[in-house]
Amino acid sequence: MPVELLNIEGLWVRYNAAEVLRQISFRVAAGDYVGIVGPNGSGKSTLIKAALGLVGGERGNVALFGTPLASFTEWRRIGYLPQRLRFFNPNFPATVEEIVGLGLLAGKQLPRKLTREDRQAVEKTLEFMGITDLRKRIIGELSGGQQQRVLLARSIVGGPELLILDEPTTALDPETRDKFYTLLRDLNRDKGITVILVTHDTSSIGTYASRFIYVDKEIIFNGTFDDFCHSTEMTNLFGEYAQHLICHRH
């Protein structure tokens, strides 16, 4: 039976008096590739932040790797690429390999130099991501797609078992976005990394994710994308014409 990496039960979140999430429950097992989809303002990003303890829930329970969130300390097992992470100023004096190396310092006392083993891990990650030739470049000089590859490399260099990404393709053109999604699928299939991907891109995620969760303050649907395409929830959300357009790609 697959190991359970994330378990959320009955999660409610409020900001001041506003209800952001209500009665959220789902589980993620080792090897899953889960796409969490919903419109702007649906609470997708808040859900991820609550799962990582960055936002407090009004009630409900969250467990990571079988450990209650309040007691969890093994953060090296998780790679996280938040929605807004900016190293993109051309004057920011950090190279690609330095940015990737930062991913090995999570939970470490700073300042700390990278060990030889750390540098080898950075080298292997740069090679896997296809960005070895960029190692000495300043990250702010790179294209949006290259920057996202670097930030993804930073998230996986420590060898996480669970990778969580919040809207990582928002600024990318469609071709670069699809390449990025394919790369995530390779990480899931070839390296065995469990992936949770938050996006508003309903149509594309169906090609890549093995599980599909549609959120709009509460969970509207949790299952495969194919089942979603044939569900009344899909018809109610998008209408028959949009349903055909979204699902026809698959």
Language model: regions and residue ranges:
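Conserved ABC ATPase "signature" region
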Residues: G101, T115-L134
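Helix-to-loop junction immediately C-terminal to a conserved catalytic motif
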Residues: L52
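H-loop (His-switch) and adjacent beta-strand-loop-beta switch element
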Residues: F212-T224
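Catalytic Walker B motif of ABC-type/P-loop ATPase nucleotide-binding domains
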Residues: L163-D166
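Conserved ABC ATPase signature
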Residues: I138-L142, Q146
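Conserved ABC transporter NBD signature motif
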Residues: G60-E74
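Conserved catalytic motifs of ABC-family nucleotide-binding domains
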Residues: G159
